[in-house]
Amino acid sequence: MKQLVTGIMLFSLLGLFSCKGQNVNHISVDGFAAALTPETPVLDVRTAEEFEAGHLRGAENIDWFQPDFVDSVKAAFGKDRPLYVYCRSGRRSAAAAEKLAKEGYTVYNMQGGYLAWTEQGREVTRYEVERFTTPKGTPVEIVLIKHASLEIRFGGLSIQVDPVAELGKKTNYATEFPKADYILVTHEHFDHFDQAAIGALKKEETILVTNARCADMAGWGRALSNGDKARFAFDIEAVPAYNTTEGHLQFHPQGRDNGYVLTLDGLRIYIAGDTEDIPQMADLKDIDIAFLPCNQPYTMTVEQCVHAAQMIRPKVLIPYHFGDTDLSGLPAQLPGMDVRLRSLR
């Protein structure tokens, strides 16, 4: 009987892991899922189009067929932890795993890929997720929904920023996200203020933080003016957001709209809202993550975005609220800064 039990246990382990090569493990969906934590490095090697249609939460997308695949992986992932890789069926990721193993990575490739994962009914998302940790060790996830819409997950809380359902690809907030503990709205333009989305996210305890105009339009909420501060489960400060270019001043008049600085256990996040490179940005201190808009004529040019980033000096810059603006040259213009180009058109 003891030999039988030992054999069953060995067979089960082989079902989760079957090694191929020194640093490559081909792993079942169950084994892959069991290994995932919020800190697990996960690489999706499918095309950008496949990734946007649906992917594993927290995965980073680097196309196996792009010429600089290995260099891009090296820039995104260290070799100090195992890397979990998948594609549609497991074939591309198997090839990628072999290649990365030769570069010194320990790689786990999911057998059957995304198809096998979804056949089991496991969770997927259409949105990229950026992960951070506060100075006190609390994990923070920022879900990059689209355009100016974000979800910040911190300490079991859901903080929605400028939720909008119908812009671009429809977002079904009622089914894709939990009810929000906090909803932050920067101003009343349609691509930032959507009462239907707010209604889908609202629960009895939800706190809405916005400018005065949106509070009036919604009929509820905590209105903050530029310079106001509030303390909830996190600290928040409303900061100026406005246009400075002649001919654009009417889009976002000074004093009406908000940007926000959130402090989560010491981690400081700047959400700029719709603004140009205004002088008040030089007063922002110790920003860890900055979301800066970059599209004309309503917000900043690439040159203005560079200037704004140079004033703020965030550790991480994530441009957002951009349309057809070409941001490909932005990282080279900000040497030494972690610039992350994501799907936030």
What are these model-predicted stretches?
Residues 166-169, 189-193, 215-218, 228-230, ...:
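Active-site environment of divalent metal-dependent phosphoester hydrolases
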Residues 132-135, 149-185, 195-199, 245-250, ...:
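Pre-active-site segment of Zn-dependent metallo-hydrolases
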